[in-house]
Amino acid sequence: MNNKYELIVAAEKQFAREVTLGVIVQQPLSVWHYLIPGMFIIDFLRRTSAISRYTKHFMFPRQLAIDAAQRLLQGYEKESVNSRLAADIETWLNSLHLDSPQLAHAQQHAVELLIAHYSKLLSAEGTSHLELIENAYGSREAYLGHVRELTAAEAEIDRAIIEKMGNNEKLKEKLQLEAKQVELRRNRILENLF
């Protein structure tokens, strides 16, 4: 199971980096990048830091879910795993100044969907992430059902973030851009399955 765990974590980290790069590349360079020598290096460092930060935030709920799925498969009590998850999600959201019951609930729901997904992957046979998905779901339609459920849960998280942070156009634009990048990456995965 350890090898599968590592395959899943590596695939999710790569997915997070690709989404981040897609979001950052969409942001155009300012005129200062062409006029001020060295601005490229400053921007490169800033974007590298942003990629690292975003990947960390994108991975946090996924890492929680992967670890929880592994603990459940090892025989841990579901109640203790779920209570730890709820506490970890609340602490994480508080650290981001996103303490909202609606957001915590939406995040918990998404993590529960991911736990079910990762449990299937960890129980499946395969030597690659795509093989694990194919063997865990058995059909394109079954996997697509998971993707649709997860996408709806992520949209609910975005709505809760907007509600908490205020109806800010820049925030909405950033969340929409992120959702679009996630959709593009998931479609690419779907093209290679079944």
Predicted regions and their residues:
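Membrane-inserting effector segments that mediate pore formation, membrane fusion
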Residues: R17-M59
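Non-transmembrane, heptad-repeat alpha-helical coiled-coil rod segments
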Residues: R71-L93
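Short, exposed interaction segments that mediate macromolecular assembly or regulatory contacts
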Residues: A106, A110-I115
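Long, helix-rich, hydrophobic modules that act as membrane-proximal anchors or helical bundle/coiled-coil regulators
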Residues: L114-F194
